[in-house]
Amino acid sequence: EKEILAASDDTLATVAIRPHVIFGPHDRRFLPAILKRAADGRMKAKVGNGSWLSDFTYIDNLIQACVAAEERCVPGSPVAGQAYFVTNGEPMAFFTFVEQVLEQLDLPKPTFAIPYAIAYAAATVNETIENWRGDNLDKEDNFSRFTIRYLCTHHYFSIDKARRDLGYEPKVDISEGIRRTVAHLKETGWS
């Protein structure tokens, strides 16, 4: 990103869009991994106390921001060479988001919480065992210290700069985005 933004000059305009946790119809990465874990009975617990907020970006809002950036990113413009966080602007607890999706799909929700310290220690043991066995720690749904830290850290960003410079205003709120996503998952048979 630094190199791309630094390349912006009088003849070439560049811009960076920084979405966080993209979701929506045709998602093949974020929600499918969570849904599979829940359907397989492998999402019985939340990690931590649930107070950590995360931002989510519905795909249509991301597209809207990309189009706005493309329209405004010309050499010499204030947008050129800038980076913009783009989310729905509605931070919520990660597991609150997940539970809303699971509930609408009639999948089991986590029933208890594991304290951060215990989850982190268990992840350390799991990583050690996976290393001994030669398993791939890079797989998407692994139980790792990184995953535990991620779940127990705030991940939300101000979209004020995108609002100001790009005229960005999310058109689809979280509730509607979840509803549309779940409808698509039901239509296409997510499993």
Model-identified regions with their sequence ranges:
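Amphipathic terminal alpha-helices
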Residues: 157-165, 169-191
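Short beta-loop-alpha junction of Rossmann-like oxidoreductase domains
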Residues: 25-30
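Terminal hydrophobic/aromatic helix or amphipathic segment near a protein terminus
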Residues: 103-151
